Amino acid sequence: ILLAMAFLTLVERKILGYMQLRKGPNIVGPYGLLQPIADAIKLFIKEPLRPLTSSKPMFILAPTLAFSLALSLWIPVPMPHPLINLNLGVLFILALSSLAVYSILWSGWASNSKYALIGALRAVAQTISYEVTLAIILLSIMMMNGSFTLSTLTTTQEHLWLVFPLWPLAMMWFISTLAETNRAPFDLTEGESELVSGFNVEYAAGPFALFFMAEYTNIIMMNALTTTLFLGALHNPLFPELFTVNFVTKTLLLTITFLWVRASYPRFRYDQLMHLVWKSFLPLTLALCMLHVSTPAMSAGIP
């Protein structure tokens, strides 16, 4: 996962480089493969500066928490076997992603800087709002799945990937994951023009690298989850045996879509973001969820 995360930074720069038709790291070195290693070395040998007015324990704890949560989210994901086969895997993921809000909040508050605090508050509002839609969409999928275990989703989708019957939910889920991971066009927390990089503005070197790593790990995680939920994680009609290969391919394609969106769209305004989730997504997801609850009841439990 850490390796994937390191090379995702490279992939992102390559794609942005190609999209903006300029020389990115796709020129330097052997295909730019040494870039992530150079970045890591550079970030971790710098001196971690700390503002005098900041509160030290929280300042150090926040990036650590962010990164550990980003890694522990991978525990219930089946690829093809989960690390721990949790009965309530989906619930576990929801709970941990809600905890990630705290790391953002603490980092913004502990930095004792106005920019950082505004950025953190935006990030928290955004993450919490979109988590509501994510939870409701997950509920609808669990109706289709019949249990909260992520591994059973593979068996559910052997005949038909859930993205086909649930395509409105899949669209909303994808946009909500974009917002949840604070990516463009929803990267309000990092509005360069007004907030100078947002809640991690006072961080340098190691702790900053931890935030960065947490962000990219979360991106891969969300795409892996999307693959598991909608794209029949390990299933491919042509090569049903290549479990992990199928999984990785789908996740990679989704991640590239994330970067593609980033290169193509301008940033949302804050009020538009909130309008989108509370006035469009929430009513729609609720309606669809009620539909998924009531259809089996109306059709007398015919699966």
Curated annotation (Swiss-Prot):
InterPro entries per UniProt: NADH_UbQ_OxRdtase_su1/FPO, NADH_UbQ_OxRdtase_su1_CS
BP GO annotations: aerobic respiration
Keywords associated with the record: Electron transport, Membrane, Mitochondrion, Mitochondrion inner membrane, NAD, Respiratory chain, Translocase, Transmembrane, Transmembrane helix, Transport, Ubiquinone
EC number: 7.1.1.2
Topology in membrane: Multi-pass membrane protein
Catalyzed reaction equations: a ubiquinone + NADH + 5 H(+)(in) = a ubiquinol + NAD(+) + 4 H(+)(out)
GO molecular function, one term: NADH dehydrogenase (ubiquinone) activity
Functional note: Core subunit of the mitochondrial membrane respiratory chain NADH dehydrogenase (Complex I) that is believed to belong to the minimal assembly required for catalysis. Complex I functions in the transfer of electrons from NADH to the respiratory chain. The immediate electron acceptor for the enzyme is believed to be ubiquinone.
Identification of the protein by name: NADH-ubiquinone oxidoreductase chain 1
Organism: Cabassous unicinctus (Southern naked-tailed armadillo)
